């Protein structure tokens, strides 16, 4: 990864690689879905994958709102807060507001240190056939605050064309949750998700790539006595930055593979081990607008799930914005 360079007014249109460096300085961790209770989890494809999601490498604050839309279904039997349900259909839209701050001082051999927090607001409509009611369809719609994401550790080391990252998102059960209700905006358990990654950026060509590996560790849902298994997740991306108008466009692709590595457990895990997975690939489009010493970035991605087991299968639509100040 090239050495840090701050965006300037009149940035030369023939230097797209500078924008790769800028992207690394404008990123943050994402907030809060795999098998387990409800066929979902706190982590989801698209959260930490592209250059805009990398930990910051320059001091200052950042604001990062996001919009996430998901539509999925599952013909398999799924454990939920309303009991065992088949033929689930879910439609969720989430607005996430958050941001953080990066310190000027470095630690641990030159690591840039940042903290961040994100709070989602979700509208969810869900339906399915209840096993306890003999297959009768049940449904509900709910909206409200979701589970808060705290990121007390965001570390980034830069060395030439490479950046090495360590981040530790913590998902707190602050969202609305009721047993007996099919849909909830919160999951009612904690998740700690340590992640390590590496990113490459070529300052001459504008080519960038990133890969991040994490392990989501879940606690038990005290209301249902259900402990969702831990999830190993890999997110990768490749992007190319090109001059466009007064700024720069980036185009690329993102791929992921999430695998549950431990069984669901607890008195409420009536379906047994119930390990799940999801994998897919989708396009990523973005635009970077330099504004003197600041910059504004937009990113859109469509992430269809191509292979799933014991969970909902559908499509994620992400719209992210990052403003560095």
Predicted feature residues:
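Short loop/turn motifs that connect adjacent beta-strands in outer-membrane beta-barrel proteins
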Residues: 36-38, 52-60, 72, 103-113, ...
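Transmembrane beta-barrel strands of outer-membrane/channel proteins
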Residues: 44, 61-71, 115-121, 166-172, ...
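Residues on the lipid-exposed face of transmembrane beta-strands in outer-membrane beta-barrel proteins
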Residues: 65, 97-103, 150-156, 168, ...
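Residues that define the transmembrane beta-barrel architecture of outer-membrane proteins
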Residues: 89-97, 111, 142-149, 186-192, ...
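Cleavable N-terminal export/targeting peptides
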Residues: 1-44
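Extracellular loop and loop/strand-boundary signature of outer-membrane beta-barrel proteins
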Residues: 50, 81-87, 134-140, 178-184, ...
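Surface-exposed strand-loop-strand hairpins of Gram-negative outer-membrane beta-barrel proteins
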Residues: 37-42, 70-94, 130-141, 182
């Amino acid at each position: 990864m090239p050495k840090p360079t701050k965006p300037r007014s009149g940035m030369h249109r023939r230097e797209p690689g500078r924008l790769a460096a800028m992207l690394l300085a404008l990123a943050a961790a994402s907030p809060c879905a795999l098998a387990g209770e409800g066929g979902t989890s706190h982590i989801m494809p698209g959260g930490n994958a592209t250059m805009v999601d990398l930990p910051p490498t320059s001091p200052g604050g950042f604001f990062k709102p996001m919009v996430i839309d998901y539509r999925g279904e599952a013909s398999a039997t799924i454990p939920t807060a309303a009991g065992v349900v088949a033929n689930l259909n879910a439609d969720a839209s989430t607005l996430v507001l958050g941001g953080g701050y990066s310190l000027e001082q470095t630690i641990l051999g030159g690591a840039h240190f940042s903290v961040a927090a994100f709070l989602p607001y979700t509208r969810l409509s869900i339906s399915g056939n209840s096993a306890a009611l003999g297959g009768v369809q049940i449904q509900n719609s709910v909206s409200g605050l979701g589970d808060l994401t705290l990121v007390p550790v965001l570390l980034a080391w830069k060395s030439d064309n490479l950046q090495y990252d360590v981040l530790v998102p913590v998902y707190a059960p602050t969202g609305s949750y009721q047993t007996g209700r099919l849909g909830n905006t919160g999951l009612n358990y904690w998740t700690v998700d340590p992640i390590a990654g590496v990113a490459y950026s070529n300052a001459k060509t504008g080519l960038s790539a990133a890969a991040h590996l994490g392990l989501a560790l879940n606690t038990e849902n005290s209301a249902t006595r259900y402990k969702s298994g831990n999830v190993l997740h890999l997110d990768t991306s490749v992007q190319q930055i090109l001059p466009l108008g007064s700024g720069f466009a980036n185009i690329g692709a993102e791929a992921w593979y999430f695998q549950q590595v431990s069984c669901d457990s607890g008195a409420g895990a009536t379906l047994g081990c119930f390990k799940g997975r999801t994998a897919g690939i989708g396009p990523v489009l973005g635009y970077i607008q330099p504004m003197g010493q600041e910059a504004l970035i937009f990113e859109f991605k469509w992430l269809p799930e191509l292979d799933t087991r014991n969970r909902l299968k559908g499509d994620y639509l992400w719209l992210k914005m990052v403003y560095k100040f």
